[in-house]
Amino acid sequence: MGTITVVINEGPILLIRALHRATTNKKMFRSTVWRRFASTGEIAKAKLDEFLIYHKTDAKLKPFIYRPKNAQILLTKDIRDPKTREPLQPRPPVKPLSKQTLNDFIYSVEPNSTELLDWFKEWTGTSIRKRAIWTYISPIHVQKMLTASFFKIGKYAHMVGLLYGIEHKFLKAQNPSVFDIEHFFNTNIMCALHRNRLKDYKDAEIAQRKLQVAWKKVLNRKNNTGLANILVATLGRQIGFTPELTGLQPVDISLPDIPNSSSGAELKDLLSKYEGIYLIARTLLDIDQHNAQYLELQEFIRQYQNALSESSDPYDTHLKALGLLETPPPQESTEKEEK
């Protein structure tokens, strides 16, 4: 009887173990298949979502949710989220999130989609006390979001308006660097130059007001490259007015070098890092031939194009994408202005 009892009692136990192994293997199989076929953008979005969930999770609950050794506690005890009252489920440990992850997601968003805008609203809708969320965003991220929104995705005015409205949050979260001259302001003016040409805008009063609003939002006014001065002067010639910006000091143009010795991953990183400067330099020469006097622009363009080798030219690609947008660049009136 003892042997039979053991066999009978172990039967369900062995069955449960087998089912657990099968379920685990099935989940692993699904995960492997998903990783194999998911796009770079989908993988990046999943990592961003997991990072956000982790940092929004109550600190007292993280040890139970994210430590594998505590997973069984969640499975055997009725531990619930104090806010949603939903049963807590174990989650894999969160790995450090690279800056490239957000770049990959930005590049993946389809034209005329609100996906990037919706994601950024959710990300910046968190408490400023969640510093890791706010400090993850870099000036280059802001530049790429603005550039992608204008040339490829659309919803540019909405993205600008969102940024204008949350500037104070980044300041309180101790990440004012995202509102700088080199990435935020210069990209804003670059897009304005293209927008004015496309829409044939010539209203000097509106242009001056828009310029002042953009300048007011700049928290880091280190004018390292001197591109801001050329951009503002080009805007003035394009519209026909004399721009006035208090605090924008004259600076000699100084652009980075792309060494010939760079190759592989290092070269790829440099091309991504300086893509914004390249777009601005090409824009300045494309919009106004007066800027051909700046030999530094031409030299930087030469170096960048040499480094591209046979890769597609990002400026040409961006202009082509802009032409393919189903809707024209947003009207000025939809931008959120703060005086």
From Swiss-Prot:
MF terms from GO for this chain are: structural constituent of ribosome
One Gene Ontology cellular component term attached to this UniProt record is: mitochondrial inner membrane
From which residue to which does the transit peptide run?
Answer: 1-37
Q: Does the keyword Mitochondrion apply?
A: yes
Q: Which UniProt keywords apply?
A: Mitochondrion, Ribonucleoprotein, Ribosomal protein, Transit peptide
| Entry's localization field | Mitochondrion
A GO biological-process term: mitochondrial translation
Q: Which domain of life is it from?
A: Eukaryota
Give the principal location in a single coarse category. Answer: mitochondrion
Also noted in the record is: Present with 16000 molecules/cell in log phase SD medium.
This protein's assembly is summarised as:
Component of the mitochondrial small ribosomal subunit (mt-SSU). Mature yeast 74S mitochondrial ribosomes consist of a small (37S) and a large (54S) subunit. The 37S small subunit contains a 15S ribosomal RNA (15S mt-rRNA) and 34 different proteins. The 54S large subunit contains a 21S rRNA (21S mt-rRNA) and 46 different proteins.
Function, as annotated: Component of the mitochondrial ribosome (mitoribosome), a dedicated translation machinery responsible for the synthesis of mitochondrial genome-encoded proteins, including at least some of the essential transmembrane subunits of the mitochondrial respiratory chain. The mitoribosomes are attached to the mitochondrial inner membrane and translation products are cotranslationally integrated into the membrane.
Family from the record: Belongs to the mitochondrion-specific ribosomal protein mS27 family.
- Its protein name is Small ribosomal subunit protein mS27
Which species is this record about? Saccharomyces cerevisiae (strain ATCC 204508 / S288c) (Baker's yeast)
- Highest classification ranks of the organism: Eukaryota, Fungi, Dikarya, Ascomycota, Saccharomycotina
